[in-house]
């Protein structure tokens, strides 16, 4: 007699789990590395490119959509990619630049929620269940995030919106590039019923072959399959698959380590240069910084506050001073000091930050963040 798996979930439990509704957004940048290169070098925008280094040795990290038309994809050997597309332009990766852009994207996310789970430099889960902006509509929030990314960074992102993580991730891929797909709580059952099992995260090539051998191709097939038999045949994975096929995913958005700083920043579509222009931006950013800080430090207690400037040549400078409480007037001196390093360069980004660490030495700190 089969011993019932302790992880088994009955129908009543499924209903109970579905009753806990969350608003999850999965944001996935469109061919991120390649998009950054095309943004920064207009000569690359109308040709097939791959991020891979200059030689035929190695593998493709990512490629743009023009290259994908030739059948090129990530993890493909570069030599094979060149056979498919002899005029493919190989671009060496600039990981430091990608990390900086990823931080800018993260800063946009943080305007809406602190519940952010990065999966890589170019994708993340956001839980916006408690966000009151845009009437609390996850659909409108996702649209606004994508608009901000495009307006401020000249990059596009796709998004999936759903009550659970795995459906949000699947949905983000359905209207690529530069689109989004929403699965409402009412649509979950029909969505997963028609979902091909290979689209479920964690279902690989070997597993899908075994599922096909059992006559399991879409979520509906699993819904109609004997649950105990599924657990016998696939163990813990069978439990997970059965839950996913019923639209259940109890995983929460995992927030990173305890916050050590709070910051806001803006990248401009047109560079600026004067103190008056910069201070106007600071005045726009400050209320957002204060609001976000109050969520973690209601009394506005801090260890330091700083200003970051990024110039038109992509070099950046940061000035930070020790302060016990957030003080808007201190940003005047910080901004002036940062602008002494301008050297006639225009400014493309301004950031404000506060550090929450304690026990810092009473001295000026000046470094990138």
Each model region followed by its residue ranges:
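DNA-contacting surface of Y-family translesion DNA polymerases
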Residues: 17, 26, 212-349, 357-362
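Gly/Gly-Pro- and Ser/Thr-rich, intrinsically disordered tail segments characteristic of DNA damage-repair
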Residues: 1-233, 239, 360, 364, ...
């Amino acid at each position: 007699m089969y011993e019932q798996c302790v992880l088994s979930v009955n129908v009543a439990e499924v209903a109970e789990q579905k009753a806990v509704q969350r608003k999850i957004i999965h944001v996935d940048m469109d061919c991120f590395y390649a998009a950054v290169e095309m943004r920064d070098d207009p000569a690359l925008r109308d040709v097939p490119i791959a991020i891979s280094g200059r030689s035929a040795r190695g593998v493709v990290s990512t490629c743009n959509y023009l290259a994908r038309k030739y059948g090129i994809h990530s993890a493909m050997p570069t030599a094979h990619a060149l056979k498919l597309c002899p005029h493919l332009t190989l671009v060496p990766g600039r990981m430091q630049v990608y990390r900086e852009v990823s931080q800018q994207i993260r800063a946009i996310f943080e305007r809406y929620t602190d519940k952010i789970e990065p999966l890589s430099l170019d994708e993340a889960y956001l839980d916006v269940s408690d966000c009151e902006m845009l009437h609390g509509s996850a659909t409108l929030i996702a649209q606004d995030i994508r608009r901000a990314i495009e307006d401020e960074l000249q990059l596009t992102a796709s998004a999936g919106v759903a009550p659970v993580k795995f459906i949000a991730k699947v949905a983000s891929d359905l209207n690529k590039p530069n689109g989004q797909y929403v699965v409402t709580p009412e649509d979950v059952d029909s969505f997963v019923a028609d979902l091909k099992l290979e689209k479920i995260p964690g279902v690989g090539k070997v597993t899908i072959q075994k599922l096909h051998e059992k006559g399991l191709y879409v979520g509906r097939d699993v819904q109609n399959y004997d649950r105990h038999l599924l657990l016998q045949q696939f163990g813990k994975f069978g439990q997970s698959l059965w839950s996913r096929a019923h639209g259940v995913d109890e995983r929460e958005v995992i927030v990173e380590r305890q916050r050590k700083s709070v910051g806001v920043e803006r990248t401009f579509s047109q560079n600026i240069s004067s103190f008056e222009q910069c201070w106007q931006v600071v005045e726009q950013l400050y209320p957002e910084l204060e609001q976000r800080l109050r969520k973690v430090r209601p009394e506005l207690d801090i260890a330091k506050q700083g200003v970051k400037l990024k110039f038109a040549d992509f070099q950046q400078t940061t000035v930070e001073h020790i302060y016990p409480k957030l003080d808007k007037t201190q940003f005047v001196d910080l901004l002036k000091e940062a602008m002494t390093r301008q050297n006639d360069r225009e400014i493309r980004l301004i950031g404000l930050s506060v550090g929450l660490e304690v026990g810092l030495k009473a001295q000026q700190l000046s470094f990138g963040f």
